[in-house]
Design a protein with these regions (language model features):
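Short S/T/G/P-rich N-terminal loop/turn motif that feeds into the first structured element of a domain
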Residues: 1-129
């Protein structure tokens, strides 16, 4: 882990308008950033939009890292915002399985053969509009 200041470009996001309490930060280093971002926008964003609120989710997004660059560091950050720790745990435990329509189309296994580099849970203490 490298300490310091990180700069990201927000590529896309969803916001339900409801304040979340916890956010899952997914750090990724896909084999192709452009394809990863495009799949998130065209496949995953509609899925999250359709299901927003059903599982306690209040937000979703994706960003690409601008700087700093380290050879083994993540280059993409995605986030999922939830209303409670209970709903975070249910989500991470796979209690809301993916529909086959998504599972059959995703290329995540090819774009990230080793999965996410890190998955972190952060508590939201405050925010501004």
């Amino acid at each position: 882990t490298h300490l310091g200041r990180y700069f990201y470009k927000q590529e896309d996001y969803l916001d339900s308008g409801k304040m979340g309490k916890y956010v899952i930060m997914n750090r990724a280093k896909p084999t192709n950033n452009t394809q990863f971002i495009e799949e998130n926008k065209t496949l995953w964003k509609p899925y999250f939009k359709k299901n927003m609120g059903k599982n306690g989710s209040t937000g979703w997004g994706i960003a690409s890292r601008i700087a700093p660059y380290y050879e083994d560091s993540s280059t993409i950050l995605t986030w999922d915002v939830f209303d409670s720790m209970t709903n975070v745990m249910k989500y991470l435990a796979g209690e809301n399985p993916l529909p086959t329509s998504i599972a059959n189309k995703t290329k995540m296994g090819e774009l990230m053969p080793k999965g996410f580099k890190a998955i972190e849970i952060w508590e939201i203490i405050g925010s501004t509009n």
